[in-house]
Amino acid sequence: MNAFLENQFGLAGKRALVTGAARGIGRAIAEALCAAGAEVCIHFNKSEGEAKKLVAQLESQGGRVFAVGGDLTDSKQADTLIAKIESRWNGLDILVNNAGDLVQRSKVEAFSDDLLDRVVKLNFHSAVYVTRRAIPLLRRGIDPSIINLSSVAAHNGGSNGATIYAATKAAIHTYTRGLAKELAPAIRVNAISPGVALTDFHRTHTTPEALETIAGNTPLKRLGTAEDHGAAVVFLCGKGASFITGEVIEINGGLWLA
């Protein structure tokens, strides 16, 4: 990497927390941040085995990385996660709020109170729980930034049975922009908005036939991959994006236009 690219896009010396980083898009983001030179905390909830394998993989490549578990729908466990990071680092430079899931497809009229609580807590409350506790650490960071994970569903209301999930991602859009104003000029806040990527998320919740249709309806005529998202996060966290805040970057092949 030449001097210009290193200065604008390198993350050497940065400390990053990626929630839900054991699999899928979160994993790809953690890999990209590590490759750019950041030291990365891989958060996991139920995927401890995958998290340990990722740590071993990145360490074998010369990366500085460790894993911490916790259920971020529980505010106390979110507090504990940040406390563990604070005990290791004196500050935090990058927070990626990636944890989230559709949980299950369901029409609104069939949504139980328990399912509603799980979907909203996992996709919205968790980001608030982690962020509010991490802000003091971020204030001690170097050009700190927060990256939230939204979804193309925030624009179109989601696919069949995903209305509540889509609403939580629309909340992430608004939360990102409001938080960007609230934390400026000290901390930048942006989001990325994936479309349909071939990860465990859509292998679990979307049929092969639906995936084929979505690919055909996407202007770039393919589905996304987890790896499509890491470079954008690296960019948003570096000096090259130092005048960007409150933005939601669409990484969905133009699906949000369709």
What are these model-predicted stretches?
Residues S106-V120, H202, A210, I214:
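Substrate-binding pocket helix/loop in short-chain dehydrogenase/reductase
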Residues N2-N7, L102-R105, N156, V234, ...:
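Short C-terminal tail/terminal secondary-structure segment
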Residues P136, A180-P185, S242:
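Alpha-helical segment proximal to the catalytic Tyr-Lys
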Residues R15, A22-R23:
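Conserved glycine-rich cofactor-binding loop
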Residues G91, D143, A184-R188, I244-G246:
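Short, small/polar-rich loop/turn modules that mediate ligand/substrate recognition or access, typified
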